[in-house]
Amino acid sequence: MALERTFSIVKPDAVERNLIGEIYNRIEKAGLRIIAAKMVHLTEEQASGFYAEHEGKEFFQPLKEFMTSGPIMVQVLEGENAIARYRELMGKTNPEEAAAGTLRADYALSMRHNSVHGSDSPESAAREIEFFFPESEICPR
């Protein structure tokens, strides 16, 4: 097993409903460590930069509007096979298809308002972590 890092977002719908602590608890119970975290309210420019790979897709503008609608929590998670483990904890993007007991099955309101984001590959994890966190803000433990 490989020790790796992944990137996670607690999205505006979950922050608004005061689910940060519950989600963090579930992350830690899954054996992942939170090694960096902060609350931010994305600007449109930041959202455009973060989601640049989706520019031109039909959901790009609604996604940006949602992700700038309120504060989010961004965090770096570390653990054995962190990317796969966190994606399993999140569940499928569509909460109706997410397995019982996953974050999206338990907390998501819809496909768009699905409470959490997690990196899907080591490459995206590295890019997403770097977007929000300089190495000096990451505290391995």
UniProtKB/Swiss-Prot annotation:
Name this protein carries in UniProt: Nucleoside diphosphate kinase
Lineage of producing organism = Bacteria, Pseudomonadati, Pseudomonadota, Gammaproteobacteria, Vibrionales
Where do the catalytic residues lie? 117 (pros-phosphohistidine intermediate)
Q: What is this protein's function?
A: Major role in the synthesis of nucleoside triphosphates other than ATP. The ATP gamma phosphate is transferred to the NDP beta phosphate via a ping-pong mechanism, using a phosphorylated active-site intermediate.
SMART domains xrefs: NDK
Query: What GO cellular component entries does it have?
Result: cytoplasm
The family database entries (Gene3D superfamilies) matched by this protein are listed as: Nucleoside diphosphate kinase-like domain
Record EC number: 2.7.4.6
Please state what class of enzyme this protein is: transferase
Question: Which SUPFAM superfamilies does this one have?
Answer: Nucleoside diphosphate kinase, NDK
Catalytic activity entry: a 2'-deoxyribonucleoside 5'-diphosphate + ATP = a 2'-deoxyribonucleoside 5'-triphosphate + ADP; a ribonucleoside 5'-diphosphate + ATP = a ribonucleoside 5'-triphosphate + ADP
GO BP annotations, alphabetical order: CTP biosynthetic process; GTP biosynthetic process; UTP biosynthetic process
**Which Cys-Cys disulfides exist here?**
none
- One Pfam family here: NDK
Concerning HAMAP family, the annotation shows: NDP_kinase (MF_00451)
Q: Cite the record's note on assembly.
A: Homotetramer.
| Organism from which the protein derives | Vibrio parahaemolyticus serotype O3:K6 (strain RIMD 2210633)
In the record, the note on similarity to other proteins reads: Belongs to the NDK family.
User: Which cofactors does this protein require?
Assistant: Mg(2+)
Primary residence? cytoplasm
Localization per record: Cytoplasm
Q: What keywords sit in the KW lines?
A: ATP-binding, Cytoplasm, Kinase, Magnesium, Metal-binding, Nucleotide metabolism, Nucleotide-binding, Phosphoprotein, Transferase
Which GO molecular function entries does the Swiss-Prot or TrEMBL record give? Answer: ATP binding; metal ion binding; nucleoside diphosphate kinase activity
Positions contributing to ATP binding = 11, 59, 87, 93, 104, 114
